């Protein structure tokens, strides 16, 4: 409609409209990851959405796992032989590896990206869940309605940009309500465990200053935190509240049921494909980050607040 109206008004330089399907015919999309995604429940739902959207567009889907930059030349060879036209990247949080993949000069979109304290220039598109505002909003609710006066973050907040934004959302809520930040309330260990090891995690919690609420980097870490608190005989939510993130299927079945923040995984998958299709059909020099709206899911671990 816009192009027709422009033509009627005499704007002869307005670009000719086209059907994206014309430019997508016989194109091949590579789903590139550094881990086996089918082992991660959150990614299974996003993958299904990606597969459905690509099928709707009659685009071929290829998969490749790049576990280390040592095998990058193998990846290049595979891309050339397979005649890949665009790349979707998931679980890519290594800055050097990202640079190598971007150097392929193909249309590329990442789901989430690396955290960096040097403010890197993202010369690629990113699609991710809305982290900061979602966590901030939930924390403000717990402050105003749940009488929470201290917060701690559980998870390696530098693991990826999403985790860092969730950490910032907690900090931002505290700042807005004049709640002092105490780093002793956090469990910010690296990724070498301890979040999958109950003994190590419970030992770290025992040494920490217990806040009114733990904000966890994701639902898996939150469920492990609930178990660690049980080992320490610390009641949830009576003594401490716990928040996760993702709204994984298992979050409904923890004891107590886990309060979390829902991510629309179907929309996330669709937007990843949409962003890549736009890069393939409408090349642009400008890179962008697209956020998918998230919302809180109160359950028992925050006293249904």
Name every feature range the model reports, one short phrase each.
Residues 149-150, 181-185, 236-241:
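Short acidic capping loops at alpha-helix termini that bridge into adjacent secondary structure
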Residues 54-66, 153, 171-197:
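Short beta-strand elements in bilobed, periplasmic/extracellular small-molecule ligand-binding domains
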Residues 198-305:
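Flexible loop/turn connectors
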Residues 136-178, 288-302:
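An alpha-beta-alpha
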Residues 23-140, 205-206:
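Alpha-helical recognition/docking segments in bacterial nutrient-uptake
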Residues 1-39:
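N-terminal helix-turn-helix/winged-helix DNA-binding helices
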Residues 125-153, 168, 172, 194-202, ...:
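Hydrophobic alpha-helical segments within soluble ligand-binding/sensing domains
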Residues 41-56, 134-137, 161-181, 224, ...:
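Short, solvent-exposed amphipathic alpha-helices that sit
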């Amino acid at each position: 409609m816009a192009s027709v109206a422009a033509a009627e008004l005499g704007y002869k330089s307005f670009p000719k409209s086209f059907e994206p399907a014309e430019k997508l015919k016989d194109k091949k999309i590579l789903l590139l990851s550094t881990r086996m995604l089918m082992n991660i429940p959150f990614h299974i739902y996003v993958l299904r959405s990606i597969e459905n959207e690509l099928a709707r567009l009659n685009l071929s889907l290829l998969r490749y796992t790049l576990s280390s930059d040592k095998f990058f030349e193998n990846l290049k060879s595979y891309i050339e032989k397979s005649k890949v036209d665009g790349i979707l990247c998931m679980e890519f949080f290594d800055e050097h590896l990202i640079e190598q993949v971007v150097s392929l000069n193909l249309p590329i979109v990442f789901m989430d990206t690396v955290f960096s304290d040097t403010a890197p220039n993202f010369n690629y598109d990113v699609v991710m869940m809305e982290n900061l505002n979602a966590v901030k909003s939930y924390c403000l609710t717990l402050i105003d309605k749940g009488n929470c006066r201290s917060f701690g973050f559980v998870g390696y907040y530098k693991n990826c940009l999403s985790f860092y934004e969730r950490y910032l959302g907690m900090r931002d809520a505290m700042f807005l309500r004049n709640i002092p930040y105490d780093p002793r309330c956090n469990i910010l260990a690296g990724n070498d465990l301890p979040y999958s090891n109950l003994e190590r995690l419970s030992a770290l919690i025992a040494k920490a200053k217990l806040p009114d609420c733990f904000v966890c980097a994701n639902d898996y870490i939150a469920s492990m935190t609930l178990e660690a608190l049980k080992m320490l005989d610390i009641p949830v939510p009576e003594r401490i509240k716990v928040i996760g993130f993702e709204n994984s299927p298992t979050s409904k079945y923890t004891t107590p049921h886990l309060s979390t923040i829902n991510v629309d995984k179907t929309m996330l998958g669709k937007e990843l494909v949409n962003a890549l299709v736009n890069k393939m059909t409408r090349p642009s020099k400008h890179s962008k980050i697209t956020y998918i709206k998230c919302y809180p899911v109160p359950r028992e671990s925050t006293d249904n607040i």
